[in-house]
Amino acid sequence: MEIWINPACSKCRSAVQLLDAEGADYTVRRYLEDVPSEDEIRQVLDRLGLEPWDITRTQEAEAKELGVKEWARDASARDQWIKALAEHPKLIQRPIITADDGTAVVGRTDEAVRDALSR
């Protein structure tokens, strides 16, 4: 199990605290420092069962500068979104937990973190 976090994020800190409280075996990836490649983002999207626009923080200043709210949300624009996430990792929703069964969740609630633990 791996968790992608931004240590400044309260939801990330809460998720890590819950994983620790449950005695989970996991690794931490500080994705703003250890930036995921486009291929890694594609892999995590497959595991999440989501599209890149589903995990994009559209309210971030960088998202507004890029104009992502105006981008198409279909197969033709998928690579554009993934490239933006790789080049601007601050736009990636967090925390993302990759579960041992090959799936992943966006762990913004205790329930989502527990769901990842149960997989």
Swiss-Prot record:
Gene3D superfamilies: Glutaredoxin (3.40.30.10). PROSITE patterns: ARSC. Disulfide bonds join 9-12. It comes from the Bacteria. Keywords: Disulfide bond, Oxidoreductase, Redox-active center. InterPro entries: Arsenate_reductase, Arsenate_reductase-like, Thioredoxin-like_sf. CDD domains: ArsC_ArsC. Transmembrane segments: none annotated. GO terms for molecular function: arsenate reductase (glutaredoxin) activity. Belongs to the ArsC family. This is Uncharacterized protein in glnII region. It comes from Streptomyces viridochromogenes.
